[in-house]
């Protein structure tokens, strides 16, 4: 073994205050594909930066999301924007790196690994393709994924499915850079 190095970093971020005169939260991030100018990320006091601001999806007994059905988080009997909540964020909790270089006689081997753990993304492609009724608009068939077909969302509800926490996915990874 010739050389081994590593690093580990922890990340905790929380908004403690916003500019004076503003409410305790502001919209941030890009609009989602199928959302009529809908944004799903906020900066809110007490939450991590760019938290996903979504509805809590309800699932059937088999774990399949039920189209347009969300948890009434404030208990007022109506699903509205007051039922949205901050769920996960795109910033990783842990970032790690490892580099190695091994030498034996006339042979050498080196590799570099890096990892990002605890970061989340909004799966906008699936959100855009999730409503099966949209697959053949204007006599043009569009591509989709098997997961979108299995969801079985037909767009028969007035509740927007694009603001569901179902589309927020874990994006943690471990990557090995080219090995030499």
What function would you assign to each model-found segment?
Residues 1-90:
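Conserved small-residue
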Residues 1-4, 101-111:
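Secondary-structure transition into beta-strands, especially the periplasmic turns and strand N-termini
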Residues 3-5, 95-99, 178-180:
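Membrane-embedded beta-strand positions in outer-membrane beta-barrel channels/transporters
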Residues 83, 111-117:
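Active-site proximal loops enriched in glycine and acidic residues that flank catalytic Cys/His/Asp
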Residues 62-64, 116-180:
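Extracytoplasmic gating/loop element in the C-terminal half of outer-membrane beta-barrel translocons
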Residues 28-42, 46-49, 87-97, 101, ...:
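C-terminal extracellular loops and terminal segments
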Residues 8-14, 104-106, 115-119, 178:
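Transmembrane beta-strands of outer-membrane beta-barrel pores
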């Amino acid at each position: 073994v010739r050389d081994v190095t590593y690093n580990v970093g922890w990340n905790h971020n929380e908004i403690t205050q916003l500019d004076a005169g503003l409410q305790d939260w502001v919209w941030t991030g890009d609009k989602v594909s199928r959302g009529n100018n809908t944004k799903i990320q906020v900066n809110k006091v007490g939450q991590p930066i760019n938290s996903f601001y979504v509805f809590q999806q309800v699932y059937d007994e088999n774990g399949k999301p039920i189209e347009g059905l969300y948890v009434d988080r404030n208990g007022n009997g109506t699903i509205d924007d007051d039922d949205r909540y901050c769920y996960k964020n795109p910033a990783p909790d842990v970032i790690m790196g490892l580099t190695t270089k091994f030498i034996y006689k006339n042979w050498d081997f080196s590799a570099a690994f890096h990892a990002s753990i605890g970061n989340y993304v909004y799966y906008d492609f699936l959100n855009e393709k999730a409503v099966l009724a949209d697959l053949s608009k204007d006599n043009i068939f569009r591509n989709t994924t098997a997961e979108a077909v299995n969801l079985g969302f037909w767009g028969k509800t007035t509740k927007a499915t694009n603001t569901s926490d179902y589309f927020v996915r874990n994006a943690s990874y471990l990557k090995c850079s080219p090995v030499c």
